[in-house]
Each structure stands twice: as structure tokens, then as C-alpha cells.
């Protein structure tokens, strides 16, 4: 049987050492361009991209997306990430806390409030675990464990399907999700892990009462590729590799979710490589922009390397807003987007 901590260590190693970006698929952001303003009416340093979300003030609309936990190595990574989130005024999600639910002695690998008392912090469990004995008690434990402001429930059907000993029982989850959302005292964020969320699924998630949807689209890390590198069976490895281009590109998924929902927060992650991608995502309707894998190697070294990485992305975001004559997030969300290939302006909801 594949232990959860061992799997977490494998994931870190593979993401760092192997090429696990989706093959033959991109985020779709490269097809989009923001309308440039040659004469901005705002000073660069006056651009203010701050917001308040669930009672927490953020300096920038950026999220350090969920990465890891459950091992001593993960503890240090999470501390570095949290220190940077605190210093820059951005949000952070922890990796799946299933390992610590199974073994409370591992809770320390997720606990970061000592270095990040003020950040918007998200707990994390797999939604499919609601079919394996998890419920309100385990969800509340995950939240309490890290003093979280909200709970991520991640969706990873493809990863589970190609993973050794993956969870195969997915029927009946809608009603369990709705019951948990109603009972839990903090907001629930439902996110994919790199294959995107469609418009119809987003609409049903809104009907369930979730607080936010993180599209986590295709074009970044492919978890079928990660699992292919873990497989020892030749046929299983081939099957996993063949799903490397599976999923909804992040930009496309984001458009679909925004168009099919109303008055729900939408986060954009999945292959976000620059602040320019982030600005495009906000112009498409995202409230927060998340990134993870590009900084993992830096997080293995020290907090300063992580800080430098995210500071650069945030500077890019600020410059992009400035060059669109957007003084704040509200104005950035209204900036026109154009399709490079067709030359057509995108229609926004």
C-alpha cells in the first residue's frame, strides 16, 4: 500500500527532477493580449492592487497555491512560503492535509501561523475523501490544525485514476459537498489540480454554496505525468503519459466558469508563469491568481529565493496594470482583451 507521506516525498522529487508540464497543451494565455495604453493617466507606483477577502487584507491578488505537507522536508518548504506570503501580503494554500488527518504527528509540517500570523490561509483536503469516511469532523480538524480562513477541497479524478492505489469511488459526492459547505463555519473553495473546471460543473458548485472556485486549468504541471513517473508497471506508465494533454486550458476554463456563474469568487491557477498572465486572468474575471510549481525549487533553498521570485511576478503584475491605465483591480478587470489569432476583442460577461 502506498503511504501518504511517501507519496508526498515522491511528488516533490518528481516535480523538481522531471519534465512534468502538460505536453501538447498550453494555458491559452499566450493567445490573449491586454489592450496597451500608450499614455497612462496613473503613476506607476500609485497602482494599488490590494483587496480585502474574507476579512483579510491582501496587498496583491496573488495566491501561493497548494504544494506540499506531510514530511519534514515539506515543513521547511511551507515555512519559507509562509514567510514570503506574510512579507508580501499575499495568500497561501497548504498541500493536502490527509497525511496529518491519518497521523496527527505530522500536523507540524503544515503549521505556519507562527511565521505568518496575518495571511489569508487555506486548509486543504481531497473532495473524494468524503466517500472514504471523511466529513465535517475531518474538515474542521484540517481548518483548526493550521488556523485557516477557508478550506480547499481539491478535485483530482484523473490523478486518482492513474495513481497506484488511487481513489476510484466518485459517485454521490455532490450531496456530500453541499452538506459540508452548509455545516462548515469557514468558506469552502473547490479547485482542480491542473485539468480545469467546466462551466456546467462551476454552475453546480455555485448551487452547492461554495465560496470560491479555483479553475486550476491545464497548461502547467500535469499530475498524470507526475504519476507516470511513479508507476513501475509499464502499461500503467504508458496510460498515465497518454493523458499529458488532457484538460481544459486555464484561460478557457476561467472564461467558462466566469460566464456560467454569478456573484461567486473565481481564482485562476494552472500554468501561471508571469504577472502578465496574472493580469490577463484578472481581466478575464479572476479575483486571485495562483502559482506553485515554478517556485518549488527556490523553496528548497531559502525564503529569500522565494521572495525574489514572487516579488518579480508582482512587479510584472503592477507594470501590466500601469500599461493598461489601470490604477486598481476594478479597473484592471475592465481592461479589454484581444485574441491574437483572430484579431477579435473578447466579449466579457
Swiss-Prot record:
Lineage: superkingdom: Bacteria
Annotated positions binding Mg(2+): 160
Gene Ontology, cellular component aspect: cytoplasm
Compartment annotation: Cytoplasm
EC number(s) reported in the record: 5.3.3.2
UniProt keywords, alphabetically: Cytoplasm, Flavoprotein, FMN, Isomerase, Isoprene biosynthesis, Magnesium, Metal-binding, NADP
Pfam families from the UniProt entry: FMN_dh
Reactions the enzyme catalyzes: isopentenyl diphosphate = dimethylallyl diphosphate
InterPro entries in the cross-refs: Aldolase_TIM (IPR013785), FMN-dep_DH (IPR000262), IPdP_isomerase (IPR011179)
BP GO annotations: isoprenoid biosynthetic process
SUPFAM superfamilies in alphabetical order: FMN-linked oxidoreductases
Cofactor(s) in the UniProt record: FMN; NADPH; Mg(2+)
Coiled-coil zones: none
Entry's Gene Ontology molecular function annotations: FMN binding; isopentenyl-diphosphate delta-isomerase activity; magnesium ion binding; NADPH binding; oxidoreductase activity
Enzyme's top EC category: isomerase
Sequence positions that bind FMN: 65-68, 96, 124, 191, 221, 271-273, 292-293
Chain residues that bind substrate: 7-8, 96-98, 159
Subunit details: Homooctamer. Dimer of tetramers.
Functional description taken from the UniProt entry: Involved in the biosynthesis of isoprenoids. Catalyzes the 1,3-allylic rearrangement of the homoallylic substrate isopentenyl (IPP) to its allylic isomer, dimethylallyl diphosphate (DMAPP).
Record-stated family: Belongs to the IPP isomerase type 2 family.
This protein's name: Isopentenyl-diphosphate delta-isomerase
Naturally occurring in which organism (per UniProt): Synechocystis sp. (strain ATCC 27184 / PCC 6803 / Kazusa)
Gene name as annotated: fni
Amino acid at each position: 500500500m502506498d503511504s501518504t507521506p511517501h507519496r508526498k516525498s515522491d511528488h516533490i522529487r518528481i516535480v523538481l527532477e522531471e519534465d512534468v508540464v502538460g505536453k501538447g497543451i498550453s494555458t491559452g494565455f499566450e493567445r490573449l493580449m491586454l489592450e496597451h495604453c500608450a499614455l497612462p493617466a496613473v503613476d506607476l507606483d500609485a497602482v494599488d492592487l490590494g483587496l480585502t477577502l474574507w476579512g483579510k487584507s491582501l496587498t496583491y491578488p496573488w495566491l501561493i497555491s497548494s504544494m506540499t505537507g506531510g514530511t519534514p522536508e515539506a515543513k521547511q518548504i511551507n515555512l519559507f512560503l509562509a514567510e514570503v506570503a506574510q512579507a508580501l501580503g499575499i495568500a497561501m494554500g497548504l498541500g493536502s492535509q490527509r497525511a496529518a488527518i491519518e497521523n496527527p504527528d505530522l500536523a507540524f509540517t503544515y503549521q505556519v501561523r507562527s511565521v505568518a500570523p496575518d495571511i489569508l490561509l487555506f486548509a486543504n483536503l481531497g473532495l473524494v475523501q468524503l466517500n472514504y469516511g471523511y466529513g465535517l469532523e475531518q474538515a474542521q480538524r484540517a481548518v483548526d490544525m493550521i488556523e485557516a480562513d477557508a478550506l480547499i477541497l481539491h478535485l483530482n479524478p484523473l490523478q486518482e485514476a492513474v495513481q497506484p492505489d488511487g481513489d476510484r469511488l466518485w459517485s454521490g459526492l455532490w450531496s456530500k459537498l453541499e452538506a459540508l459547505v452548509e455545516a462548515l463555519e469557514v468558506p469552502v473553495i473547490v479547485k482542480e489540480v491542473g485539468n480545469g473546471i467546466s462551466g456546467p460543473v462551476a454552475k453546480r458548485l455555485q448551487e452547492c454554496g461554495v465560496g470560491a472556485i479555483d479553475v486550476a486549468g491545464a497548461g502547467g504541471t500535469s499530475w498524470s505525468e507526475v504519476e507516470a513517473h511513479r508507476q513501475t508497471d509499464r502499461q500503467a506508465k504508458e496510460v498515465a503519459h497518454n493523458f499529458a494533454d488532457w484538460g481544459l486550458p486555464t484561460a478557457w476554463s476561467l472564461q467558462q466558469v466566469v460566464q456560467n456563474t454569478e456573484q461567486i469568487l473565481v481564482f485562476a491557477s494552472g500554468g501561471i508563469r508571469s504577472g502578465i498572465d496574472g493580469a490577463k486572468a484578472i481581466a478575464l474575471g479572476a479575483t486571485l491568481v495562483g502559482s506553485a510549481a515554478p517556485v518549488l525549487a527556490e523553496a528548497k533553498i531559502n525564503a529569500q529565493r522565494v521572495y525574489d521570485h514572487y516579488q518579480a511576478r508582482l512587479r510584472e503584475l503592477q507594470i501590466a496594470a500601469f500599461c493598461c491605465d489601470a490604477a486598481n483591480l476594478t479597473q484592471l478587470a475592465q481592461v479589454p482583451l484581444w485574441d491574437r489569432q483572430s484579431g477579435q476583442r473578447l466579449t466579457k460577461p
